[in-house]
Amino acid sequence: MKVRAAALGLAAIFSGLQTAAHAADDPLKVCLDEDRPPFSAHHRGKPGTGFDLTLAQAIADRMGRPLKIQWFESKLDEDSSPQLEANALLSDGRCSLVGGYALTRDSLVVPGVKTARLPDFEGATRDDRRRRIDIGVLTPSQPYVYSPLTVVLGPKARGRTINNIGDLSGLRLAIESGTLGDAILMSFEKGRLIDNITHLVPGRDDLLGALERGDHDATLLDLARFDAYRAAHHDTGLSASGYYYPIGANRGYVALAGESALLVAVNTALADLQAEGKIAGFARQAGLTYLQPREPTIIGDVWEKIIQR
C-alpha cells in the first residue's frame, strides 16, 4: 500500500513537472493594435514595430516563454468599443493579454452585454467576422506608462507659452469632434473658447496636416499621436508646448479574470523592468515620450472630471 501511494505521489510530481515544462514552452500570446504607432504598428509584409511589441518581448523573455503577437485592427466608428473588442479577443482565445490598454473605470467594468463581435484581426476568416463571442470580465495588470493629452502648436504659434488651457485664448483652435479634447475645450470656463474652435471629423479630416498648413494655431490631442506624427514628418513645423492636461490615463495589460497567475508573473516582470530602467529605454527606442504611471492607477469617470474642472 505504501509502495503504491509513493508511486502515485511520484507520478503526480512527474505530471506536474511535465505540465510546468509544457507551460514554459507555450507562447505568451499578446494582442496588439496594428495601427497605434509608436505603441504598436504592423503592416502586411513588414515586421511589427513599437514600444508595446518590444515590452511584450521583454516580458516573454523574463517568463522564459516564446512570444506570439495577434495583430488586430480597432474600429473607428461610433459603435465600436475598445473594451468589448479586447474582451472578445481574450474570450475567443486569440491571446491571453491585450497590451496598451487604457486603465479607466469605465473600461474595466463588468460588461453590460453577454456577447461581442471580434475586431478584424490577422488571419480572420469571413466566419470570424460574423461570430459573436461569449465574453468575460477584464482584469488589469499594473500600469507601465502614462498617456496624457498635450497642446500642439502650429507654426504661427510656435514659442507661445502654454501653462493651462486658458493660455489658448485668442488662438485659432482645431479639434476632432467627439473626442476628449473636444469636451475639454468646449466646456472650458463655460464655453469661453467656443468661438475660436473649428471641429474636424476624425478619420476624414487631417487634423495635424491642417495645423501644419497654418489653417489653425493649436490643438489638444494624445501625446503619443504627436510622437508618431513627428517620427513620420522630421521637418514638421509643429511644436510640442510641453503642457500636459492634468487628466490622463495609465496604460497596462488586461487579461480575463481567471488569469491571476499570469498577471502575477507579468506584474513581476514589469516591476523588474521598471526598476532597471528598461521600460523608459524601450520608449526612447520607439520614439515615444515616456511618462511614468501616476496615481490613481485606474482613473474614474473621465467625462465627469472634465466637467468638474
Question: Model-found features: residue ranges?
Answer:
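Extracytoplasmic small-molecule ligand-binding "clamshell" domains
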Residues: 24-109, 200
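A ligand-binding cleft/hinge motif common to bilobed small-molecule-binding domains
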Residues: 91, 99-130, 184-188, 212-247
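Ligand-binding cleft/hinge of the Venus flytrap
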Residues: 40-43, 56-72, 115-116, 164-167, ...
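Periplasmic-binding protein-like
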Residues: 33-35, 127-138, 142-150, 223-287, ...
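Short loop->beta-strand "edge-of-pocket" segments that line small-molecule binding or catalytic clefts
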Residues: 28-34, 49, 164-182
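Bacterial N-terminal signal peptides
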Residues: 7-16
